[in-house]
Amino acid sequence: MADGSGWQPPRPCESYRAEWKLCRSARHFVHHYYVHGERPACEQWQRDLASCRDWEERRSAEAQQSLCESERARVRAARKHILVWAPRQSPPPDWHLPLPQEKDE
């Protein structure tokens, strides 16, 4: 990976620019603030865009390493969320019975 001969960035540079632009939009700001209670952090997208452009222009090893680490961190962050509900292997035994509110009527 250090030689960079056949390596390509994980995403096209346009993708990093689009993500950065979306992150800075008013709509995303309002949504993120409503959901998380804090401002969205867009600096990483900007750093990734700069690294991608640096890679395209100079084939910089530092830019390559930065992009790889950033994408790995994104994958780890996406995988760390656990399921809220445990998946069922089979339906409950009484699934066909009427619901309690239907019994009262």
UniProtKB/Swiss-Prot annotation:
Q: Which UniProt keywords apply?
A: Secreted, Synapse
Q: What's a GO biological-process term for it?
A: regulation of synaptic plasticity
Location in the cell reads:
Synapse; Synaptic cleft
Any one cellular-component term (Gene Ontology): synaptic cleft
- Source species, domain of life: Eukaryota
Q: Name one Pfam family in it.
A: PANTS-like
Q: How is it modified after translation?
A: Rapidly degraded by proteolysis following neuronal stimulation, resulting in increased AMPA receptor clustering.
Major subcellular location class: other
InterPro entries, from UniProt?
Answer: Pants/Emi1-like
Instruction: Report the sequence similarity comment from the record.
Output: Belongs to the UPF0545 family.
Oligomeric and partner information: Interacts with RTN4 isoform A/Nogo-A; the interaction results in enhanced RTN4-mediated inhibition of AMPA receptor clustering. Also interacts with NCAM1, RANBP2 and CCT8.
Q: What does this protein do?
A: Negatively regulates long-term potentiation and modulates adult synaptic plasticity. Stabilizes the interaction of RTN4 isoform A/Nogo-A with its receptors, inhibiting clustering of postsynaptic AMPA receptors at synaptic sites. Upon neuronal stimulation, degraded at synapses, reducing RTN4 signaling and allowing AMPA receptor clustering at individual synapses.
- Protein name, as recorded: Synaptic plasticity regulator PANTS
The source organism is Pongo abelii (Sumatran orangutan)
